[in-house]
Structures are given as C-alpha cells and as structure tokens.
Amino acid sequence: MSSDGNVTGGGGANTVGVTNKPFFCYQCNRTVNVTISPPSSDPTCPICNEGFLEEYDNPNPNQGSGFLNPNPNSIPFHDLFLTLSDPFASLLPLLFPSSSSTTTSSSASIDPNNPSLSGPTRSGRGDPFAFDPFTFIQNHLNDLRSSGAQIEFVIQNNPSDQGFRLPANIGDYFIGPGLEQLIQQLAENDPNRYGTPPASKSAIEALPLVNITKSNLNSEFNQCAVCMDDFEEGTEAKQMPCKHLYHKDCLLPWLELHNSCPVCRHELPTDDPDYERRVRGAQGTSGGNDGDNSGQRSDGDNRTVERSFRISLPWPFQARGPGPAPGDNAETRQEDLD
C-alpha cells in the first residue's frame, strides 16, 4: 500500500499502513476523510459512525470537495460553490467545457421510454468502460448544441437577487432523483425523437442533377455522404443548395422523411405551415432573411432551425431559501422562437 496517506503519530513515529482516504457518506450526504488502519473492519463515517460510504477519487484534487452538500452550515460555504453573477451565461460553460477537456464520444441518444439509471451515479473506481451518466449527459447536451439547440436552464424558487451559487462540479448537482429528472427532461426534448418534417415536393423536384466531373472527384464532394461510395465520372448526382452531392436513390428517401441535408443540416422548405412559421421566426431573430421563399434558396440563407427548450431545476439549498413543494415537478416547455 502506498505510504502517501500514512498518518504520523503524536510522538513522531510513523504508523505503517494507516491511511486517510476520502469517502462520500450517503447518510451525511457529504465527503468525509476516513482513517483506515488494516486489518480493521469496513470504514465508517467519523460523523455519523455509519458505513454507507463510497470511496471517492477526486479527479481534480485542487478543486476541493466536489460533492454538493444540501446543508451549507455543515462545512464552509465558500469551499463548495462558485459564485455566478450571471447564472445562465455562467452555467453553460460548466455544462459544455472545451473540447480539450471533454472526452470525445459518439452521438448520444436518450431512450425516452427508459430514462432512468441503475447503479451508483458516481464511479471514481472500477471498470473504466462502466457507464458514466455525467459524461453521457454532457455529450448529449453537446450534440444538442451542435444541432442548433438553444438550451435555457431555469432555477426554480431562487431566493437570491444577486445571482446564485452552483457546485464547483456541476455534475454533483444532479445526483439521485435530480439526475433522473434531468435525463427525463432531455429525453422529452431529444430532437431525434421527433426530427424535422419532410421536404416539400416542389423543393425536392427543384434540386438539380449535376454531372460528376474530374473536378468533383478531386474535391471534398467526391463521394455520396449517405452510402459513402465514391462517385464515378460521367454519372449524375442530386445537389442540395448547400452544394453537398448525393446519389438520387440515396437522397430522395431521406428527404421524404426529413428536410435537412444529412451532412450539414441545411434545410429545404416544407409543406408544414407551423414549422415554416418557426423557421421564419428563428431567421427574424437572428437577423432576418433575404425574403426569398421559393424552393431554390440562396447560399447565404441558412434554414437550420434553432430549437429552444427550457430545463427547470429545483433550488437545492433549503437553508438559503424556499425549495419547491414536495409535489412539484420540474417542467420542460418547448419554446417557439417567434
């Protein structure tokens, strides 16, 4: 066993094998340091003397205790939280860190029929391939943002007029029921659950057929992005307004279900008046469009719709202000941008 955590007795003698380790006590709902001296029995919390503990390996030892303690009087408040003057602007960087500090993952998708998790919500040890709910949620939120989603987090019953405080590790806010509540809300707002409507027939018919030339084969548009087969010189391909090329038999079935380019999500007009109204509202919010409503859109007309949804989170610090009533559930509302 490593001697890094060895405890030195009062007389200066080194007590071999005695170590201090951080644990999370589920009874006290906080991190504690437990002195372990083999071959003793299972570790117990020095505060409540209970054994409902999980060893905690802090990935960032300079960050201090990362666990959220709902009782801010038990340990110094400033050691646990970061003060945020602008809650919404400051919350997003915590949820969406830079790519250099985020593990790359494939597209995340949440099953809305089974959003709950089983097993411990924090895995400081064990199987490196074990499911990590916090990484999963973070990657899923990044996927939503990359597809144009605007995510607004609302803290319910916030008693502070000067902003509010969040855990240094935002993942620690969502533990137990709070974590499952967040997953449920994300599942209800997953754009993959609904998708975009089909492209209009007139827009599909207006897509040009282009002859594949050597210049195409030497460019980034040298293969169909659906079937991934290389184009052959002299053959024809359908071209989207964004200039991406596809085999006709690959693109048309997709456009009969979704109006977006499979690569860049550039959107064709639809026959859905409600959806078109949201598109116009989104474009008006971002600076308007050029007024061209025909099937052929100009290259500068970005029809990627920014989906917006709101995630309501309960105010967790009961000692700092009133929390939601026990029967209250966080609600998520799909917001139109017009």
Curated annotation (Swiss-Prot):
* Composition bias type Polar residues, residue spans: 110-121
Q: Which UniProt keywords apply?
A: Metal-binding, Transferase, Ubl conjugation, Ubl conjugation pathway, Zinc, Zinc-finger
Task: Mention one GO biological process in which this protein takes part, according to its record.
Answer: seed trichome elongation
Gene3D superfamilies per record: Zinc/RING finger domain, C3HC4 (zinc finger)
Enzyme's top EC category: transferase
Pfam families per UniProt: zf-RING_2, Zn_ribbon_19
Zinc finger intervals, RING-type = 224-265
Q: Which GO terms describe its molecular function?
A: ubiquitin protein ligase activity; ubiquitin-protein transferase activity; zinc ion binding
Skewed-composition ranges (Basic and acidic residues): 267-279, 298-309
Q: How is it modified after translation?
A: Auto-ubiquitinated as part of the enzymatic reaction.
Q: Which reaction does it catalyse?
A: S-ubiquitinyl-[E2 ubiquitin-conjugating enzyme]-L-cysteine + [acceptor protein]-L-lysine = [E2 ubiquitin-conjugating enzyme]-L-cysteine + N(6)-ubiquitinyl-[acceptor protein]-L-lysine
UniProt tissue specificity: Mostly expressed in cotton fibers, and, to a lower extent, in leaves and flowers.
From the UniProt record, give the pathway where this protein acts. Answer: Protein modification; protein ubiquitination
Residues that span the membrane, as ranges: none
* Region Disordered, annotated ranges: 102-124, 267-338
User: Cellular component terms, GO, for this chain's entry?
Assistant: cytoplasm
Q: Which InterPro entries match?
A: RNF126-like_zinc-ribbon, Znf_RING, Znf_RING/FYVE/PHD
Return the EC number: 2.3.2.27
Q: What does this protein do?
A: E3 ubiquitin-protein ligase which accepts ubiquitin from an E2 ubiquitin-conjugating enzyme in the form of a thioester and then directly transfers the ubiquitin to targeted substrates. Promotes polyubiquitination of target proteins.
Q: What is this protein called?
A: E3 ubiquitin-protein ligase RING1
